[in-house]
């Protein structure tokens, strides 16, 4: 995936309690749910993806790939509050790695919070200055305007006339 939120980079990572990589997913109940979640996410079935990623984090709360997939699914479902919690959990497990920061910055871009998106994406850029996904998301941020807001998410809640 060139831009946006990438879940594939985390498909083979699980971590222990202090964040060290433990190896390739496989054979565990959470691994099957992560695989199914990735399949549904790729097909645009974000509700089903969320279901599988949620089951994966319940089975293995230390699975970075499950938390990232869950966060990305919540973003697509516009459940930004839950996505934020999932990203913070992934960050606590895996640290402030560039691709994870890229996803977290994109999350704030989707929310319409350009300030937070810029801060996090710039941190990702400092850690991986030549990463094309990070550069693409920074370009999206700089070229973003209220008029082309993704999926109509406003920066501030709109007040509707009650007539």
Where do the PLM segments sit?
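Structural marker of alpha-solenoid helical repeat scaffolds
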Residues: 25, 59, 92-94, 126-127
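Bacterial Sec signal peptide processing site at the extreme N-terminus
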Residues: 2-25
């Amino acid at each position: 995936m060139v831009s946006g939120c990438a879940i594939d980079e985390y498909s083979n990572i699980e971590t222990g309690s202090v964040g060290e990589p433990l190896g390739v997913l496989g054979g565990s109940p959470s691994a099957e749910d992560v695989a199914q979640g990735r399949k549904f996410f790729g097909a645009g079935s974000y509700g089903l993806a969320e279901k599988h990623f949620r089951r994966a984090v319940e089975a293995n709360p230390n699975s970075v790939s499950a938390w990232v997939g869950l966060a990305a699914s919540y973003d697509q479902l516009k459940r930004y509050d839950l996505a934020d919690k999932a990203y913070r959990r992934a960050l606590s497990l895996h640290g402030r790695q560039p691709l994870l920061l890229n996803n977290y910055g994109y999350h704030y871009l989707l929310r319409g919070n350009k300030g937070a998106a810029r801060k996090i994406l710039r941190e990702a850029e400092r850690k991986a200055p030549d990463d094309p996904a990070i550069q693409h998301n920074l370009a999206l941020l700089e070229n973003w305007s209220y008029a082309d807001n993704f999926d109509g998410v406003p920066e501030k809640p709109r007040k509707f006339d009650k007539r």
